Amino acid sequence: MRTLVLIRHGESVWNRENRFTGWTDVGLTDKGAAEALRAGRTLKNEGFAFDEAFTSVLKRAIKTLWIVLEEMDQMWIPEHRHWRLNERHYGALQGLNKAETAERHGMEQVHVWRRSYDIPPPPLAAGDPRNPARDPRYAELDPADIPLTESLKDTVARFLPYWHETIAPRILAGRRLLIAAHGNSLRALVKYLDGIGDDAIAGLNIPTGIPLVYELEDDLHPIRSYYLGDPDEVARATQSVADQVKR
């Protein structure tokens, strides 16, 4: 049996402000840092240990990983950062308040943008200062790989090559891995691992800062998955993600 642990970053400043974040590089709140600390403590107390860790190039995920590993006394393990683990790009919605956007465009339209599989939000204009092509961390990427918006389908297509080429071979080699990433990049991976249908994926919400453990067969098919946390607390945190457009 192989074990993989996923964790969505702790609450970010824009999570607290209920804004669409995407590739915008915002930090953790004090609550988010505390969530990461608690996750690290829980993992350590439950006997988990890791050989390598993976994260995005966005600081809310990087800092979550650091806090978790520090609490586990494992900051020395190899850490791999890659843009393919970034959050889904929310296009022209980035920075907008979710509830206010729902008031302007309607709950149904915002739900489609947030949770449909293959419909992206309106794109950024190429000259928009939020265009990731202006960010030095993406300077060496093929311009065709830099999104101006993404659907979840696009995020799956971005994430899976890195999974197949880099992450999965390490799991098959017996490495114990931790992935600290984002709500939608993790939804993309969970969709793939669990074989969730394109329509059903709309109902999947991943809470911040709670470890999600996968026990995998030798061929990496899931045996089971579960959150490390109080079930009632996990349910409340998950529902809170679903209710963001109502706040």
From Swiss-Prot:
GO molecular function annotation: phosphoglycerate mutase activity
Top EC group: isomerase
Reactions that this protein is recorded to catalyse: (2R)-2-phosphoglycerate = (2R)-3-phosphoglycerate
Keyword Repressor on entry: no
GO biological process, one term: gluconeogenesis
Active site, renumbered: H9, E87
Pfam family name, one: His_Phos_1
EC number: 5.4.2.11
Binding site for substrate: 8-15, 21-22, 60, 87-90, 98, 114-115, 183-184
Recorded metabolic or biological pathway in which this protein acts: Carbohydrate degradation; glycolysis; pyruvate from D-glyceraldehyde 3-phosphate: step 3/5
Similarity section: Belongs to the phosphoglycerate mutase family. BPG-dependent PGAM subfamily.
PANTHER family referenced in this protein's UniProt entry, alphabetically: PHOSPHOGLYCERATE MUTASE
Summary of the function given for this chain in its UniProt record: Catalyzes the interconversion of 2-phosphoglycerate and 3-phosphoglycerate.
Protein name (database record): 2,3-bisphosphoglycerate-dependent phosphoglycerate mutase
Source organism of this protein record: Geobacter sulfurreducens (strain ATCC 51573 / DSM 12127 / PCA)
Recorded name of the encoding gene: gpmA
